[in-house]
Regions:
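Periodic small-residue-enriched repeat registers in elongated scaffold domains
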Residues: 1-174
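C-terminal intramolecular chaperone/autoprocessing and neck/assembly modules of extracellular spikes
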Residues: 162-216
Length: 216
């Protein structure tokens, strides 16, 4: 059975639901709520305005379990999620949140504004499978975007950038400074060391080379 309520909605496939205005739910168990949303594939879900869940380049019923909510969001991969405004999730189990962000690695989380996409491994492969490393790029696990916004349409601008990137191999890149706070409330027996300049002058600095031949 299908349910279509409102105006110019289209519910196609078993147990599909389209409610609102010009929504399209196609594929078993898919739901589209709001205005001009498309849930294309099995068990996909959209809510809001002009969101797309599923890969519309494929046949009805292919892919599934994608979610897009908010405005202008696209979740095109299996079990992906795109939230808020004009975000895109293009790889399996990836999630994009914020404004104009893109999550294009497996299981990746993109937040913030207009991150730089295309880094890591944008294929559907993951570097660690069945307890063994496959040799593929570890890929990006988490990114915070700090790119610009296009004032004419409120979407991502032409200058994407990243404030912080964490890769699956544990490496990370921070674009700015890292400030580590020292909270006095968490400490006891605080004793003043007195003059420490003479002690600092005793520090014997060293340079060395890592085994990977990267000079430090």
């Amino acid at each position: 059975s299908t349910i279509s309520l409102g105006k110019e909605n289209w519910a196609e496939g078993a147990s599909t639901v389209a409610i609102g205005f010009k929504n399209h739910a196609a594929g078993g168990g898919s739901t589209a709520l709001g205005q001009e949303n498309v849930s294309w594939g099995t068990t996909n879900f959209t809510a809001g305005y002009q969101n797309v869940a599923g890969d519309t380049s494929q046949g009805v019923g292919s892919g599934g379990s994608a979610t897009a909510m908010g405005k202008y969001n696209v979740a095109s991969a299996d079990a992906s999620m795109a939230l808020n405004r004009a975000t895109t999730a293009t790889n399996q189990a990836a999630t994009s949140m914020g404004l104009g962000t893109t999550a294009d690695n497996v299981g990746m989380l993109a937040v913030g504004v207009n991150n730089a996409s295309g880094a890591g491994d944008t294929s559907a492969n993951y570097y660690y499978v069945d307890g063994a490393y496959t040799g593929s790029n570890p890929g990006v696990a988490f990114v915070v975007g700090n790119g610009d916004i296009n004032s004419s349409n409120g979407r991502a601008g032409d200058n994407p950038s990243n404030a912080f990137v964490v890769n699956y191999d544990g490496s990370a890149t921070l674009a700015g400074d890292l400030t580590v706070n020292s909270d006095m409330r968490l400490k006891s027996n605080i004793v003043t060391l007195g003059s420490t300049l003479s002690k600092l002058l005793l520090i014997d600095g060293k340079s060395y080379t890592m085994k990977s031949n990267e000079a430090i």
